């Protein structure tokens, strides 16, 4: 289909941008939904379902909890001196030794998990006048009665249990973690049978702290054939400090210390299988990619992970505003420029030209403006990731029953942080999308203005993104306009001459209306004059008589 007013002495050049039949809706500051040619999802909403063992060292706890592995439960001996970046506790983990409790369980678990090692150093404690290496049928090691391998159960020797007073200095340059305990017999008879005294006492001190525990004698629910309990305590001895242990009974003594390390190690409860793969980010649901800035898989993470948000989807515009091409038009229609719609089928660029001249029609992309837009958009995703990825882990928070209010406060703080980040993510993406659309629109306008400045008076802006060129412009001429080498002076005289000739025949639509109305008014006036003259002539000849009655 020819463009209006086109012939061999003129040409038409239209500027346009890429469009797709079905774009993607994104949110901007000014619009909740605006269609763009392309967008990237920013929220990771699914996991692989498995925990990758690379680059992080993953230690599968299997049927052992971290504390059981720490104490040396017989069925956890395989974990002695192990190290990890992430210790994975399973839901089927169980204890299989003398029943115990840890009054500050969460703190001990977190301390050991962050240390990332169960490296144990045996020390030569001297326990005089007592029997060492006590055991229980509740803690079988093979066919024999046993006990926690990292603890030493001290009982009476003969009929005496002397007061124990032992010191152990820390002459090294690292922190030492000592695990010790207090036995709570189920009856008074058990108390005297094991420790002679009717009531024991255990005091463990350093220069910075002191703990004194008095056993609580009494029956408790039976667990693995035992109604007594052991309470587990722990003490950290700094370099240059001294550990002092004083007791007259009921002491579960340390055999040595755990070497403490500082680092980013952690612990996570998960039943996801561990597999040979690579992933920087781990959640209880499994590993997730960290190529997106946000995720809503799980609040608990380890490694370099996307920020957790509430949204299921946030789309970042990576293309321009999409205005699908009207399908009723061909390559050239009544309106072919970017003002009304985009162009589908532009596979080699975002912006381009369509022309019609004496040699036919054609289309070509403008790579300069396309590259300028792409360069500004390409770094957006990486910049958003850099702003949001956490280079640390979000650990599980655990509190005892007496710390219920602290737990509620912690939950409130975490929920508030998530709400804040979810809002920030929404605003951040909306701002980036607004910028993308504005800059792609700007590149289109720059290309149009650059073309208009080249053509000057040799062409007329048709108001729809097209120029009517008033001189013969073959394909070489069109190419010179596209690449910026067009010389308007060469065609100036021809363009002016053709413009005057065409304007002598063509009338712009605005003047046509005025002329039509004026012509209609003059015609009506002349018709009235002729009709009135005929009536007056007829009256004079007597052919018409007029009677006026009052």
UniProtKB/Swiss-Prot annotation:
- Cytoplasmic topological intervals: 536-550
What is the protein name given in its UniProt record?
A: Hemagglutinin
**What pairs make up the disulfide bonds?**
14-466, 52-277, 64-76, 97-139, 281-305, 473-477
Sorted UniProt keywords: Clathrin- and caveolin-independent endocytosis of virus by host, Clathrin-mediated endocytosis of virus by host, Disulfide bond, Fusion of virus membrane with host endosomal membrane, Fusion of virus membrane with host membrane, Glycoprotein, Hemagglutinin, Host cell membrane, Host membrane, Host-virus interaction, Lipoprotein, Membrane, Palmitate, Transmembrane, Transmembrane helix, Viral attachment to host cell, Viral envelope protein, Viral penetration into host cytoplasm, Virion, Virus endocytosis by host, Virus entry into host cell
Q: Where in the cell is it found?
A: Virion membrane; Host apical cell membrane
Tell me, in a sentence or two, what this protein's role is.
Binds to sialic acid-containing receptors on the cell surface, bringing about the attachment of the virus particle to the cell. This attachment induces virion internalization either through clathrin-dependent endocytosis or through clathrin- and caveolin-independent pathway. Plays a major role in the determination of host range restriction and virulence. Class I viral fusion protein. Responsible for penetration of the virus into the cell cytoplasm by mediating the fusion of the membrane of the endocytosed virus particle with the endosomal membrane.
Give the GO terms filed under biological process for this record.
clathrin-dependent endocytosis of virus by host cell; fusion of virus membrane with host endosome membrane; fusion of virus membrane with host plasma membrane; virion attachment to host cell
Species for this entry: Influenza A virus (strain A/Duck/Hokkaido/10/1985 H3N8)
> TM spans, by residue?
515-535
The record's Pfam families line, in alphabetical order, gives: Hemagglutinin
């Amino acid at each position: 289909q020819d463009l209006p007013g086109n012939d061999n002495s003129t040409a038409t050049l239209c500027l346009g941008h890429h469009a797709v039949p079905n774009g993607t809706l994104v949110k901007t500051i000014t619009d909740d939904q605006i269609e763009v040619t392309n967008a990237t999802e920013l929220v990771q909403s699914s996991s692989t379902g498995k925990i990758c063992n690379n680059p992080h060292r993953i230690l599968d706890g299997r049927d052992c909890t971290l504390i059981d592995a720490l104490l040396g439960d017989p069925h956890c001996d395989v974990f002695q001196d192990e190290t990890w970046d992430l210790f994975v506790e399973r839901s089927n983990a169980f204890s299989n030794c003398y029943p115990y409790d840890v009054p500050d369980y969460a703190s001990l678990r977190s301390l050991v998990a962050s240390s990332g090692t169960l490296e144990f150093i045996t020390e030569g404690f001297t326990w005089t006048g007592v029997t060492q290496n006590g055991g229980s049928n509740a803690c079988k090691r093979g066919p024999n009665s046993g006990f926690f391998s990292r603890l030493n159960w001290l009982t009476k020797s003969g009929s005496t249990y002397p007061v124990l007073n032992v010191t152990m200095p820390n002459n090294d340059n690292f922190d030492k973690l000592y695990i010790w305990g207090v036995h709570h017999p189920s009856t008074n008879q058990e108390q005297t049978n094991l420790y002679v005294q009717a009531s024991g006492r255990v005091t463990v001190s350093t220069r910075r702290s002191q703990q004194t525990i008095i056993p609580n004698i009494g029956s408790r629910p039976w667990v693995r054939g035992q109604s007594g309990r052991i309470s587990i305590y722990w003490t950290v001895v700094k370099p240059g400090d001294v550990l002092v242990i004083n007791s007259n009974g009921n002491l579960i003594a340390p055999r040595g210390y755990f070497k403490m390390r500082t680092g980013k190690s952690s612990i996570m409860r998960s039943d996801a299988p561990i597999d040979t793969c690579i992933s920087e980010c781990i959640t209880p649901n499994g590993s997730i990619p960290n190529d997106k800035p946000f995720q809503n898989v799980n609040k608990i993470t380890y490694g370099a992970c996307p920020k957790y948000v509430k949204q299921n989807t946030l789309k970042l515009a990576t293309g321009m505003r999409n205005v699908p091409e009207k399908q009723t038009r061909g390559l050239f229609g009544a309106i072919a420029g970017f003002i009304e719609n985009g162009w589908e089928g532009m596979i080699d660029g975002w912006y381009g030209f369509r022309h019609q001249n004496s040699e036919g029609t054609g289309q070509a992309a403008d790579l300069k403006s396309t590259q300028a837009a792409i360069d500004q958009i390409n770094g957006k995703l990486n910049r958003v990731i850099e702003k949001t990825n956490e280079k640390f882990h979000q650990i599980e928070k655990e509190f005892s029953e007496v710390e219920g209010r602290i737990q509620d406060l912690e939950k409130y703080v975490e929920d508030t942080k998530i709400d804040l980040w979810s809002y920030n993510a929404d605003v951040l993406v909306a701002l980036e999308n607004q910028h993308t659309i504005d800059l792609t629109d700007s590149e289109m306008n720059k290309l149009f203005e650059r073309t208009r400045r080249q053509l000057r008076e040799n062409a007329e802006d048709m108001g729809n993104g097209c120029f009517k060129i008033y001189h013969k412009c073959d394909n070489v001429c069109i190419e010179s306009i596209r690449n910026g080498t067009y010389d308007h002076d060469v065609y100036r005289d021809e363009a002016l001459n053709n413009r005057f000739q065409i304007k002598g025949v063509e009338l712009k639509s605005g003047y046509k209306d005025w002329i039509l109305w004026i012509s209609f008014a003059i015609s009506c006036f002349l018709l009235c004059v002729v009709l009135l003259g005929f009536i007056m002539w007829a009256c004079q000849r007597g052919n018409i008589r007029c009677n006026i009655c009052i």
